Amino acid sequence: MPSPLDASSLNRFRGAFTAIVTPFSADGSRLDFARLEEQIAFQKQGGVTGIVIAGTTGESPTLEEGEYRELVDRGVALAHGLGLLAIVGTGSNSTAHATHLQKTAAKAGADAALCVNPYYNKPTQDGLIRHFLAMADAAPLPIMLYNIPSRTGVALTSETIVRLAQH
């Protein structure tokens, strides 16, 4: 189980974080890592605290396994090389897949994980709790809950968030 975050650890996440897009080649056949590097450098010049890699804006549900892993590895390394924090989207509608993505992000050195509610299957609040606890236990990364019910079909309640925060 991850250790609780203290106030000084949470202070690292103050400031602006940009959810970056995942750049592809002109024909869409491969990731464009030169453009990724340019994009992250541009964010640094803009004064952000960090970036979000492989979030919804970053095409996370459509990336193949190898693409996701390489994007996360390179994106985290580029961000850290510029002194930026890197939050990685690890959400999925499958708990097994989400925990796998959580481990991938941790291995890459991500500073935190952005975890969306499982989409399409509309879990109960107890189902959401089990899903997010499995993610928390999969890797020692702080988790940021991404509650977007218009896209996932289910909203986290404040009671559920309180229960998760006690983990």
Model-identified regions with their sequence ranges:
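Active-site/ligand-binding-proximal alpha/beta "capping" segment
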Residues: 160-167
